[in-house]
């Protein structure tokens, strides 16, 4: 009778454990790249957006209802996931490229941020040609706020977005909360309603610029 361990069985066992771990990792990556487990956005209503309280970012902050932004001429509003994010800076720059067309239509371009850290908003202003307001309750990121956590870094689309923004010369930092997903709204004047609502499904999921312009062209300014 031999008391020596059977290294063949031991080796096979280690291979089984290793293959199981690799299989689990591959399964996790595959699942992370499907939309099955992405939280679905709840569509905002005009009434919900109208009641949101925003704050100006000047030396004397003023709190006001968001409906002021689109009351007369409608508005295009970007809910910024994180001002220091290079993907957000890319989208802000692209939205700002529409400023000449929006100005011809008389439609203002705005952004909201959920926090103000250091000079992050001021730095973001280099990429965004519109006024920026603070949404402390993060209401423009709702009605049901959605987050993409670390699993987002396993998504192929996210890495494609990273590479695209990097190749286009954008850079950023890691300051602030960047997991709560943002979006873009085009809202008609007065009670006209929400003409476009784009909600990020993953980091760097940008709005279609032609869709923004198409929606903005439908805005009917209110008579003064």
Curated annotation (Swiss-Prot):
Subcellular location: Cytoplasm
InterPro entries: PXL2A/B/C, Thioredoxin-like_sf
Pfam families assigned to the protein according to its UniProt record, in alphabetical order: AhpC-TSA_2
Chief subcellular location: cytoplasm
GO molecular function ontology, one term from the record: antioxidant activity
Region annotation Thioredoxin fold: where it falls in the sequence: 14-112
Top-level taxon in the UniProt lineage: Eukaryota
Keyword Cytoplasm: yes
Keywords: Antioxidant, Cytoplasm, Redox-active center, Selenocysteine
Catalytic residues as annotated in Swiss-Prot or TrEMBL: 88 (redox-active)
Record GO cellular component, one term: cytoplasm
Function according to Swiss-Prot or TrEMBL: Involved in redox regulation of the cell. Acts as an antioxidant. Inhibits TNFSF11-induced NFKB1 and JUN activation and osteoclast differentiation. May affect bone resorption and help to maintain bone mass.
Family: Belongs to the peroxiredoxin-like PRXL2 family. PRXL2A subfamily.
Leftover remarks: The active site Cys-88 corresponds to one of the redox-active cysteines of peroxiredoxins.
Name this polypeptide is given: Peroxiredoxin-like 2A
């Amino acid at each position: 009778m031999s008391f020596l361990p059977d290294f063949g069985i031991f080796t096979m066992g280690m291979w089984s454990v290793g293959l199981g771990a690799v299989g689990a990792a591959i399964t996790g990556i595959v699942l992370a790249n499907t939309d099955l487990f992405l939280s679905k956005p709840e569509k905002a209503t005009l009434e919900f957006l109208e009641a949101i309280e925003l704050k100006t970012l000047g030396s004397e902050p003023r709190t006001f209802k968001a409906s002021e932004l689109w009351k007369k001429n409608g508005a295009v509003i970007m809910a910024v996931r994180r001002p220091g994010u290079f993907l957000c800076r890319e989208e802000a720059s692209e939205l700002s490229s529409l400023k000449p067309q929006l100005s011809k239509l008389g439609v203002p371009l705005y952004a909201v941020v959920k926090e103000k850290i250091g000079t992050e908003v001021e730095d973001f202003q280099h990429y965004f040609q519109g006024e920026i307001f603070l949404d402390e309750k993060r209401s423009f990121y709702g009605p049901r706020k959605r987050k993409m956590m670390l699993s987002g870094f396993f998504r192929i689309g996210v890495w494609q977005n990273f590479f695209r923004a990097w190749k286009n010369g954008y850079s950023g930092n890691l300051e602030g909360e960047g997991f709560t997903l943002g979006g873009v709204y085009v809202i008609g004047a007065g009670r006209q309603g929400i003409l476009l609502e784009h909600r990020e499904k993953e980091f760097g999921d940008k709005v279609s610029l032609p869709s923004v312009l198409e929606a903005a062209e439908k805005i009917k300014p209110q008579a003064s």
